[in-house]
Amino acid sequence: MKALVWVAVGGALGAIVRYFFYKFVPQVYDFPLATFLVNVVASFLLGFIIGAFEAKPWGQQLKLALATGFCGALSTFSTFAADNYILLRSSKYITAFVYTAVSVGLGIVSVALGEDLAQRLLK
């Protein structure tokens, strides 16, 4: 039960941060910039958390709060999928392709960069 509380606390904070991204990041043309940014930032943070907890074991509860709760609530695959559906339905095929390719590619790179940064900082 305690684990659920940690996930819920992290999730609440992640959802609040995501809300502020959507409130303050403007949409650029047809590109869903806020969704793109929250997913890249969450990927970087998750990579950092992975690297940090490999370098120093800070406890499973904190890891649950940060990785599962915060990063899970900050990132949003369902919105990513819906954004792409809307782009495709609107015949914006190139934008949908670029959004998908750059989101997935940069997401993977962000995880790797976050993990590397954490390991360098925490040696």
Curated annotation (Swiss-Prot):
Transmembrane helix as UniProt keyword: yes
Cell compartments where the protein resides: Cell inner membrane
GO cellular component: plasma membrane
Primary residence: membrane
Keywords: Cell inner membrane, Cell membrane, Ion channel, Ion transport, Membrane, Metal-binding, Sodium, Transmembrane, Transmembrane helix, Transport
InterPro entries, sorted: FluC
Membrane topology: Multi-pass membrane protein
One Pfam family in the UniProt entry: CRCB
Enzymatic reactions: fluoride(in) = fluoride(out)
Leader sequence residues: none
Annotated Na(+) binding sites: 72, 75
GO biological process: cellular detoxification of fluoride
Activity regulation behaviour: Na(+) is not transported, but it plays an essential structural role and its presence is essential for fluoride channel function.
Positions in coiled-coil regions: none
TM helices/strands, residue ranges: 5-25, 33-53, 62-82, 94-114
Similarity annotation: Belongs to the fluoride channel Fluc/FEX (TC 1.A.43) family.
Annotated PANTHER family: FLUORIDE EXPORT PROTEIN 1-RELATED
Primary role: Fluoride-specific ion channel. Important for reducing fluoride concentration in the cell, thus reducing its toxicity.
Protein name per Swiss-Prot or TrEMBL: Fluoride-specific ion channel FluC
Organism: Ignicoccus hospitalis (strain KIN4/I / DSM 18386 / JCM 14125)
